[in-house]
Amino acid sequence: FEKVQHKLPMLSLANAFNQNDLEEFIDRIKKYLNLDHREIIKFICEPKIDGLSINLNYENGILISASTRGDGKIGENVTSNVGNIIGIPKRLQGQSYPKQIEIRGEIFLNKKDFIKLNKKIDKKNKFSNPRNAAAGSLRQLNSNITKQRPLKFIAHGIGKCSKEYSTISNFFNDLHK
């Protein structure tokens, strides 16, 4: 696959396993933003979908490229393999989308589809988990194989965008118009 440099880095998520981890994370955010330790920060929380991170680049509402996260700075161009994935529109709906926007999210397989897929594959080629199945399916050189896999997409944020949003909530609200 052709290498693609991201316009803005695609950072990976860190885990918080307990209350202390979460409090340390909040302290780091406040320090980074030069906020008083008493300042209250609002968060949007969402379930962690364990899939393959993807960056979808739209211009004038039309999908022009899709790339994997890779090392966060450079990913792989997988545009030819995302066309039939549930949840990835080739054209954005409505009128409120920005002229240029990168939508970021996860390509994944749900557990039920993962089990079905592994039943169809011979024993030596079975996938060890749904995340590996999603990654292996997306990175097929033969896009017909990718089309046959029940991959799904869920958006969780934006990269480079021609319109500024003060919060991610404002972005999601704007997209629903």
Regions found by a protein language model. Name each.
Residues 1-177:
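RNA/tRNA-interacting regions in translation and RNA-turnover enzymes
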